[in-house]
From Swiss-Prot:
Protein name stated in the entry: Chitin-binding lectin
SMART domains reported in the protein's UniProt record: ChtBD1 (SM00270)
Domain (Chitin-binding type-1) ranges: 2-45
Disulfide bond sites: C5-C22, C16-C28, C21-C35, C39-C43
Keyword Disulfide bond among record annotations: yes
Keyword Disulfide bond: yes
Organism: Viscum album
MF terms (GO), sorted A to Z: carbohydrate binding; chitin binding
Keywords recorded for this protein, A-Z: Chitin-binding, Disulfide bond, Lectin
Function: Chitin-binding lectin which is specific for N-acetylglucosamine oligomers.
Subunit architecture: Homodimer; disulfide-linked.
C-alpha cells in the first residue's frame, strides 16, 4: 500500500513508515521507481538497486 510523503504529505516533509523511500512524486515504496532519481527522503532504503 502506498502512502504520501515528502512535500505532498500532510504535514509536508513526512517520512515513510518502515524506512521506505519517498519518491519525487511523494509516494512511499521500495522499488527503483521510488528510491532512485529525484527521491525525496530515505533514498538508500534499498541498497541493492
Amino acid at each position: 500500500i502506498d502512502h504520501r510523503c515528502g512535500r505532498e504529505a500532510t504535514p509536508p516533509g513526512k517520512l515513510c513508515n518502515d524506512g521506505r523511500c519517498c519518491s519525487q512524486w511523494g509516494w512511499c515504496g521500495t522499488t527503483q521507481a521510488y528510491c532512485s532519481g529525484k527521491c525525496q527522503s530515505q533514498c538508500d532504503c534499498n541498497r541493492d538497486l
